[in-house]
């Protein structure tokens, strides 16, 4: 049985790596930056009042990523937010290997173009080590989500962790994948 290789994984091997080696003047193929994981996080602060919201967030993340999310709980109590330690406040999925490449493919080619008034993702959201984070205002930009079944619009943050050592390397990697940065 042949192992499944996603379209973007093949694209990385055949197009992105040679392009990055030339652009970043890398001699050894193992030095070429690569994506290690993509973390999709949904913070649901209103879950303190309405516990059904966390279930909706978990279901939406499962549909979007194809993987069961991890329930995130409050680390300590905070009276100002009516929050007790151990209360569920979010959901998180860590994507690796083929699911990661499939998700990136859908994000770049389907989801981001569906965002209203989209002019590109901000190019200043790098962390100094080549990792990139972008936020989405609602989950409806994903075609898998049924508009009629959504109770509340929930935003999410998507973090792409790469082996790049600098922001320039990380930007070059994501640009080679087709990430539409603002001019």
From Swiss-Prot:
The keyword Ribosomal protein belongs to this UniProt entry's keyword annotation: yes
Gene Ontology BP, a term: translation
Ranges in a coiled coil: none
Database matches in InterPro entries: Ribosomal_uL5, Ribosomal_uL5_bac-type, Ribosomal_uL5_C, Ribosomal_uL5_dom_sf, Ribosomal_uL5_N
Source superkingdom: Bacteria
UniProt-listed Pfam families: Ribosomal_L5 (PF00281), Ribosomal_L5_C (PF00673)
Record's keyword terms, sorted: Ribonucleoprotein, Ribosomal protein, RNA-binding, rRNA-binding, tRNA-binding
MF GO annotations: RNA binding; rRNA binding; structural constituent of ribosome; tRNA binding
Keyword hit for Nuclease: no
A cellular component annotation (GO) from this entry: cytosolic large ribosomal subunit
Assembly and interaction partners: Part of the 50S ribosomal subunit; part of the 5S rRNA/L5/L18/L25 subcomplex. Contacts the 5S rRNA and the P site tRNA. Forms a bridge to the 30S subunit in the 70S ribosome.
UniProt function note: This is one of the proteins that bind and probably mediate the attachment of the 5S RNA into the large ribosomal subunit, where it forms part of the central protuberance. In the 70S ribosome it contacts protein S13 of the 30S subunit (bridge B1b), connecting the 2 subunits; this bridge is implicated in subunit movement. Contacts the P site tRNA; the 5S rRNA and some of its associated proteins might help stabilize positioning of ribosome-bound tRNAs.
Sequence similarity: Belongs to the universal ribosomal protein uL5 family.
UniProt xrefs under NCBIfam families: PRK00010.1
Annotated protein name in UniProt: Large ribosomal subunit protein uL5
């Amino acid at each position: 049985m042949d192992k499944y290789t996603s379209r973007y994984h093949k694209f990385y091997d055949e197009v992105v790596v040679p392009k990055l080696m030339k652009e970043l003047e890398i001699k050894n193929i193992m030095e070429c930056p690569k994506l290690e994981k993509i973390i999709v996080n949904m913070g649901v602060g209103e879950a303190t009042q309405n516990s059904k919201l966390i279930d909706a967030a978990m279901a939406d993340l499962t549909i979007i990523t194809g993987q069961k999310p991890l329930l995130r709980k409050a680390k300590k109590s905070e009276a100002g937010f009516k929050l007790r330690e151990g209360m569920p406040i979010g959901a998180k999925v860590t994507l690796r290997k083929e699911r990661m490449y499939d998700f990136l493919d859908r994000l770049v080619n389907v989801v981001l173009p569906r965002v209203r008034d989209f002019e590109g993702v901000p190019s200043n959201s790098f962390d100094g080590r080549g990792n990139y984070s972008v936020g989405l205002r609602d989950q409806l930009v994903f075609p898998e989500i049924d508009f009629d079944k959504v109770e509340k619009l929930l935003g999410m943050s998507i973090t792409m962790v790469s082996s790049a050592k600098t922001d320039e390397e990380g930007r070059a990697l994501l640009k080679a994948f087709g990430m539409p940065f603002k001019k």
